[in-house]
Amino acid sequence: MSAIIELKKVTFNYHKDQEKPTLDGVSFHVKQGEWLSIIGHNGSGKSTTIRLIDGLLEPESGSIIVDGDLLTITNVWEIRHKIGMVFQNPDNQFVGATVEDDVAFGLENKGIAHEDIKERVNHALELVGMQNFKEKEPARLSGGQKQRVAIAGAVAMKPKIIILDEATSMLDPKGRLELIKTIKNIRDDYQLTVISITHDLDEVALSDRVLVMKDGQVESTSTPEQLFARGDELLQLGLDIPFTTSVVQMLQEEGYPVDYGYLTEKELENQLCQLISKM
């Protein structure tokens, strides 16, 4: 599968007198239809990277290719039309008096016909389960509902790429999981490419690959399973240790023959059943 995003030796500084570059020769690619999670401590360069991809910042050196086109000043708006951004605080994105108005805002700015706007708005709200709230004021919604509306606004623009910048971090665990599942369903149905900056294990577990950033560089890329198998190293990367990994570690320390590495809850359940049956 071809790459829809590619960064080649990208370097960026916010200030000329910085001791270390904010990004230092960053190179990676994202495949069409892939879900890539980007993790790392604060200051590792995660948010800077996605702002460069969206053309909100300009690299000092290196190149960024989006959907086959080199990102430049002349085509930055064309590139942005291919990308939907959802941020940590949805209140910063709302501009409409009602949910329906807000989702329609970007479409109206593109000069899309009224009937097409109505159809796209209704479809996007249906995808995120918010069609019954379209006459509501965004300020009166819960945190999870606000993020669903923000996602609907992005999806209505029919982007090829959706970027989530800590989009689930302000939600409670239930709301976070529901939102992640909604994003997964939309991604699967429409073959969208998803880039997610996150510290949430459930979000990371659903991704195809995980890119770890450290001190403005790419520390590693791996599958979620390979990442979770790193055990205590996860704490140094800004993640918790998955519950199943902690259980596996405890069993191994007690001498039980459990497979090393990350297991899903179902896989761990199967292993425990096998152990019990042999006792």
From Swiss-Prot:
Pfam families in the record, alphabetically?
Answer: ABC_tran
Where is this protein localized, as stated in its record?
Answer: Cell membrane
Name the GO cellular-component terms: ATP-binding cassette (ABC) transporter complex
GO molecular function list: ATP binding; ATP hydrolysis activity; ATPase-coupled transmembrane transporter activity
Please name the CDD domains in this protein's record.
ABC_cobalt_CbiO_domain1 (cd03225)
Q: What kind of membrane protein is this, topologically?
A: Peripheral membrane protein
Alphabetic keyword roster: ATP-binding, Cell membrane, Membrane, Nucleotide-binding, Translocase, Transport
Looking at the record, the residues that make up the ABC transporter domain are: 5-240
Chain positions recorded as ATP binding sites: 40-47
The protein's superkingdom reads Bacteria
Q: Which Enzyme Commission numbers does its entry carry?
A: 7.-.-.-
- The keyword Phosphoprotein belongs to this UniProt entry's keyword annotation: no
Q: Which Gene3D superfamilies match?
A: P-loop containing nucleotide triphosphate hydrolases
Cell membrane listed as a keyword:
yes
Record InterPro entries: AAA+_ATPase, ABC_transporter-like_ATP-bd, ABC_transporter-like_CS, ABC_transpr_CbiO/EcfA_su, ECF_ABC_transporter_ATP-bd, EcfA_1, P-loop_NTPase
- Quaternary state and interactors: Forms a stable energy-coupling factor (ECF) transporter complex composed of 2 membrane-embedded substrate-binding proteins (S component), 2 ATP-binding proteins (A component) and 2 transmembrane proteins (T component).
- Which protein family is it in? Belongs to the ABC transporter superfamily. Energy-coupling factor EcfA family.
State what this protein does: ATP-binding (A) component of a common energy-coupling factor (ECF) ABC-transporter complex. Unlike classic ABC transporters this ECF transporter provides the energy necessary to transport a number of different substrates.
Q: What is this protein called?
A: Energy-coupling factor transporter ATP-binding protein EcfA1
Organism, as annotated: Streptococcus pyogenes serotype M1
In the UniProt record, the gene name given for this protein reads: ecfA1
